[in-house]
């Protein structure tokens, strides 16, 4: 499956605080394999929250990413 990843300005600004380039590619690949991963956030119209365990950290060192997947046009918005 092909997806276009679109980052909000806030996500782009803060991404380097949580992901290095390799880790971010692994995260994107995970979403490419299963864009419906994560829990739907009630009342958002379909936004999802996914937990991501960063390499070298325990579960508590992981991060949460909010995203919205539009399957009809193959876009995934990283919020």
Where are these regions (language model features)?
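N-terminal targeting/export leaders
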Residues: 8, 25-29, 38-41
């Amino acid at each position: 499956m092909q997806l276009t990843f679109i980052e909000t300005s806030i996500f782009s600004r803060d991404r380097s605080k949580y992901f290095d380039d390799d880790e971010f590619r692994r995260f994107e690949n995970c979403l490419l394999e299963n864009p419906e991963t994560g829990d739907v956030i009630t009342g958002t119209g379909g936004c999802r929250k996914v937990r991501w365990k960063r390499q070298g950290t325990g579960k508590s060192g992981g991060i949460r990413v909010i995203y919205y997947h539009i399957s009809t046009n193959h876009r995934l918005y990283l919020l």
